[in-house]
């Protein structure tokens, strides 16, 4: 996993970590996916940046409901530019 590079990324990751350490244990294991939705968001922010990472994490949270089967759903890798330099 990459590390957050900007102060905004570090703040977002810190807030998610607080959720993981304080709130999540009170709720119990509920996530249908691996990695968990909170870890997915951290990975997405570190890999794609703050805005796209939050977008990807939000899309993932919308899939986390009883009608979705869940399973392994890793963060997509960044796409390479198709233009030649």
Swiss-Prot record:
Pfam families reported for this sequence: YidD
Membrane topology qualifier: Peripheral membrane protein
Function: Could be involved in insertion of integral membrane proteins into the membrane.
Family membership: Belongs to the UPF0161 family.
Disulfide bond annotation, renumbered to this chain: none
Keywords on record: Cell inner membrane, Cell membrane, Membrane
Localization terms from the record: Cell inner membrane
UniProt protein name: Putative membrane protein insertion efficiency factor
InterPro entries, per database record: Membr_insert_effic_factor_YidD (IPR002696)
Example of a GO cellular component annotation carried by this entry: plasma membrane
Superkingdom classification of source: Bacteria
């Amino acid at each position: 996993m990459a590390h957050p590079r900007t102060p905004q990324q570090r703040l977002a990751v810190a807030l998610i970590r607080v959720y993981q350490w304080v709130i999540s244990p009170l709720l119990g294991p509920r996530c249908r996916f691996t990695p968990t939705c909170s870890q997915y968001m951290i990975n997405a922010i570190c890999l794609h940046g703050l805005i796209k990472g939050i977008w990807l994490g939000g899309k993932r949270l919308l899939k986390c409901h009883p009608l979705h089967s869940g399973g392994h759903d890793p963060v997509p890798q960044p796409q390479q530019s198709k233009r030649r330099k």
